[in-house]
Amino acid sequence: CVIVPLLMLAANLLAWLRWGTDLPMVDDWRVYDERNALSLAPARLFEAINNTLTPVGLVLDVLAQRWFGGNPLPYQTVSMLGVLGGLLWLQWRLLSWVLRRTEWAALAFAFSVFMLQSDTYWGAQNLAYHQALPLVALLAAMSLTLRGGWPAFPRVSAIFVLGVVAGLTYISGAVAAFVIGVAWTG
């Protein structure tokens, strides 16, 4: 059961490397049009794009521009392995801790195959994976909270940093509208 999601991740990766395109999609052209693909200026990082703030994601995009020269194939390959691989690893880690029996954890983990369907976060825009990064950070924080193993100060510090990363990775207009609504009624 454990091997099925891992095989699906490998199949996604191979399919992306075989049939992926190295041309940026429409949303990815904005940085070229505005000539700020390499800008780490705070005003740019905290600028709303499509009614969404993504400062951490924009930093990752700039680093990818510098390291991969704007080629989406290696960028999306690394993001796929990092995000989907991270989600799988964290899910396995949490399931094996909560369920305590390897057979049950393996059976529950097998259902994570559905999150690995093609064209979920990869194959279109480079920046689409930004939406999944908060989940990776929050699952990592949950893992540190539940499993422990670290002394209190480094663990709490890491959880705080993961919370900040999750919060600054993808802030949609809907979240901002909700917060403003709560603040006005509160």
Annotate each language-model stretch with its function:
Residues 1-11:
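Start-transfer (signal-anchor) and selected internal transmembrane alpha helices
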Residues 10-30, 121:
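Helix-to-loop transition at the C-terminal end of transmembrane segments
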Residues 46-69:
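Short hydrophobic/aromatic helix or loop-helix immediately within or flanking a transmembrane segment
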Residues 67-86:
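Loop-to-helix entry region of an early transmembrane alpha helix in multi-pass inner-membrane enzymes
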Residues 80-101, 139-144:
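Transmembrane-helix motifs of polytopic, lipid-linked glycan transferases
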Residues 94-117, 136:
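Transmembrane-helix signature of polytopic, membrane-embedded enzymes
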Residues 133, 138-156:
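Membrane-interface transmembrane helices that cradle and orient dolichyl/undecaprenyl
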Residues 154-169, 174-181:
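Membrane-interface alpha helices of multi-pass inner-membrane proteins
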